[in-house]
């Protein structure tokens, strides 16, 4: 990955009017080349349970703007898209809410920067008070969108690390119609990028026994259900088991991860789960 701050970016923005760019290092936090996390990394010991409690976040409070945007708000979002830091700062100075969820845009300012994957804009907004946790997009149901979960969904280890270093909860939750509330593990697949993200999340203490609010799926069940090779499945299952995942947990239909391995005709993985002994 290229260095977060480049000389060409700085020259271009300064030439545009001398706006204050995000510092190369913000409170000791900056984008850098993300190291590959060794597969030998061990995670903190998790406490297994038959039905872990579902954690629904309450720490995120988001101003909700359900109307047409003002001229200043429209200009602010356009400035985010154009990476115009002078205009962004001007609109903030005029009172545009940096943390509001704007229903017309279906996101927050930081959410828009995340979707555009503009690292300079992400840091610019965080340095000016954007909430690194995420936002609530349904006030009645407290449905949340975690920026860290979104970064994991991209398989972007550098962004996951960056947001976590800024203070994003490693156990932050997003909500979807399928799973209800879910953590970052439920966004991952079998690619090398995803596995590196998984190793980092586990090493930082993510709840490997999290139960989704719809269906009662655990990470073990999630990967047991996935259409992947037996070798890939066992590799991931071992990572989760080594971190304390409990194979005895049943979902809302009463099935365990072993049952889903059998449903995928993966006898080797089913036997692996039944005979696993943690070292």
Where are these regions (language model features)?
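Hydrophobic helical h-region of N-terminal Sec-dependent signal peptides
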Residues: 6-14
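Leucine-rich solenoid repeat scaffolds
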Residues: 247-279
């Amino acid at each position: 990955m290229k260095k977060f701050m480049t000389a060409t970016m700085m020259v271009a923005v300064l030439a545009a009017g001398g706006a204050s760019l995000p510092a190369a290092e913000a409170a000791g936090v900056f984008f850098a080349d993300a190291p590959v996390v060794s597969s030998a990394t061990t995670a903190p010991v998790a406490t297994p349970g038959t039905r872990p409690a579902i954690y629904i976040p309450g720490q995120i409070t988001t101003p909700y703007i359900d109307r047409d945007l003002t001229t200043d708000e429209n200009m602010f979002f356009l400035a985010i898209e154009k990476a115009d830091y002078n205009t962004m700062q001007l609109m903030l100075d005029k009172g545009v809410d940096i943390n509001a969820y704007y229903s017309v845009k279906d996101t927050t300012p930081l959410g828009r920067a995340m979707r555009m994957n503009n690292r300079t804009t992400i840091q610019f907004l965080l340095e000016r008070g954007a909430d690194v946790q995420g936002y609530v997009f349904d006030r009645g149901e407290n449905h949340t969108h975690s920026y860290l979960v979104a970064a994991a969904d991209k398989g972007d280890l550098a962004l996951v690390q960056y947001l976590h270093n800024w203070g994003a909860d490693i156990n932050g939750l997003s909500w979807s119609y399928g799973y209800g509330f879910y953590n970052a593990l439920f966004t991952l697949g079998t690619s090398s990028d995803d596995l590196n993200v998984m190793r980092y999340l586990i090493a930082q203490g993510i709840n490997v026994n999290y139960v989704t609010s719809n269906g009662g799926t655990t990470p073990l069940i999630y990967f047991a259900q996935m259409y992947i090779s037996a070798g890939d499945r066992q590799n991931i299952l071992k990572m989760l088991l080594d971190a304390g995942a409990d194979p005895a947990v049943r979902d809302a239909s009463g099935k365990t991860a072993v049952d889903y391995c059998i449903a995928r005709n993966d006898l080797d993985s089913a036997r692996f789960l039944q005979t696993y002994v943690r070292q």
